[in-house]
Amino acid sequence: TEVIAVSMDNKEKALKTKSDWSIKNLNIAYGLSEDDARKWGLYISKSIKEAESDIFCEPGLFIIREDGTLYLANTSNMPWARPDLTDFPAKLIFAEENNYPVRGNY
């Protein structure tokens, strides 16, 4: 299992954020294009604060199976609607152990 965070930020800003937030055990990918963010169904926003990039994507959470199929997709148009990840690992273990099927595919 591999966890990767992906950002539309450039390398410098992504690495600064990783350092500022004390993120140690998470790979950060950067340079996601607006077009690719839209293909993933991510909402695009314009900055409202000086610290924000001019154009950026709102958060999304995706789980891709080893065979490349999408297992979970969660997107939001508001940053404060991010899912609480506290219990997320336990929920993933439950889903795997119980062979929980993909939902919302109709």
Annotated model-derived regions:
Residues 1-106:
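Chalcogenol-based redox active-site neighborhoods
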